[in-house]
Amino acid sequence: MTVRIAINGFGRIGRNVVRALYESGRRAEITVVAINELADAAGMAHLLKYDTSHGRFAWEVRHEREQLFVGDDVIRILHERTLADLPWRELGVDVVLDCTGVYGNQEHGEAHIAAGAKKVLFSHPGSNDLDATVVFGVNQNQLRAEHRIVSNASCTTNCIIPVIKLLDDAYGIESGTVTAIHSAMNDQQVIDAYHSDLRRTRAASQSIIPVDTKLAAGITRIFPQFNDRFEAIAVRVPTINVTAIDLSVTVKKPVKASEVNQLLQKAAQGAFHGIVDYTESPLVSIDFNHDPHSAIVDGTQTRVSGAHLIKTLVWCDNEWGFANRMLDTTLAMAAVDFRLDASASTKL
């Protein structure tokens, strides 16, 4: 059975979801029936075909009136501003992937369902009243049929949660701090211009810019036992893609850096294959562009101080890895209702 999805919002994540679907060979499992985007069809087709970060799309892309053609597939284009007016019932939509970054609470999800969708997956953390928040590879098995409105968390949460779980299971985490070194985003300015956050009034290409982050809250949403035991900060750097996360944790059991690396490498080759990767190559951020993993542990940067303080550096393609997890979570949500096999949904 094929899951019929619609995408609401065809920005960075929405377009990468479509690209990831075609590149990963999952079109027998998922089909895109519609995309709702306020921009015109010509712009949608052009930005799907040509991408500064990820290169030229291998599939033929064209548009005719309000239809987008990807290879031989036809996707209906919509330009609805009001969720209630979306024709999800008419189109037989199983799961809406809301990638606007604007909508994200239970009321918004209910609006999609009232329009005829069976389930909704938000591409950001959303509000605390959602039915579930999923970090694929860690807690997707907790999904139930009654979880209709779900968050896929954030790219940085998907990056760091698997590593935190591995370290906690092995050594017992007492507390931790996280620094997200994040590529620039479209809420920043090309040149100095007004913004409610005065730091984000400054040109993104010229400065390292501290920004607010809810990453610590994202960690405790998945692992409530860490409430008040993690803190996080974030800076934006003048690159257009790929993020590094500096994770420091104090642990109960004494450990050596070599043992930490052995643990993480084994997980990447085993239980977390396809979600976590491990490298000791002398790589830089651009080398992780278009990497489908949620997290890539840089073993050359692992440090242990006093046997109980662990520092790790974890990379992720904050667009491509997250887009692949959107597809994984979509299949996991569908599997609950439609008894699809989502166990092998992660394909590299």
From Swiss-Prot:
Alphabetical list of Pfam families matching this protein: Gp_dh_C, Gp_dh_N
Matches recorded under InterPro entries: E4P_DH_bac (IPR006422), GlycerAld/Erythrose_P_DH (IPR020831), GlycerAld_3-P_DH_AS (IPR020830), GlycerAld_3-P_DH_cat (IPR020829), GlycerAld_3-P_DH_NAD(P)-bd (IPR020828), Glyceraldehyde-3-P_DH_1 (IPR006424), NAD(P)-bd_dom_sf (IPR036291)
Keywords, alphabetical: Cytoplasm, NAD, Oxidoreductase, Pyridoxine biosynthesis
GO cellular component: cytoplasm
Record pathway: Cofactor biosynthesis; pyridoxine 5'-phosphate biosynthesis; pyridoxine 5'-phosphate from D-erythrose 4-phosphate: step 1/5
Enzyme Commission code(s) on record: 1.2.1.72
Reaction equation(s) it catalyzes: D-erythrose 4-phosphate + NAD(+) + H2O = 4-phospho-D-erythronate + NADH + 2 H(+)
Compartments where found: Cytoplasm
Highest taxon listed in the record's lineage: Bacteria
Entry annotation: catalytic residues: C155
Signal peptide: none
GO biological process: glucose metabolic process; pyridoxal phosphate biosynthetic process; pyridoxine biosynthetic process
UniProt: NAD(+) binding residues: R12, I13, R81, N318
Site (Activates thiol group during catalysis): H182
Entry binding sites for substrate: S154, C155, T156, R200, T213, K214, R236
Family recorded in the similarity comment: Belongs to the glyceraldehyde-3-phosphate dehydrogenase family. Epd subfamily.
Function: Catalyzes the NAD-dependent conversion of D-erythrose 4-phosphate to 4-phosphoerythronate.
This protein's name: D-erythrose-4-phosphate dehydrogenase
Species: Salmonella paratyphi A (strain AKU_12601)
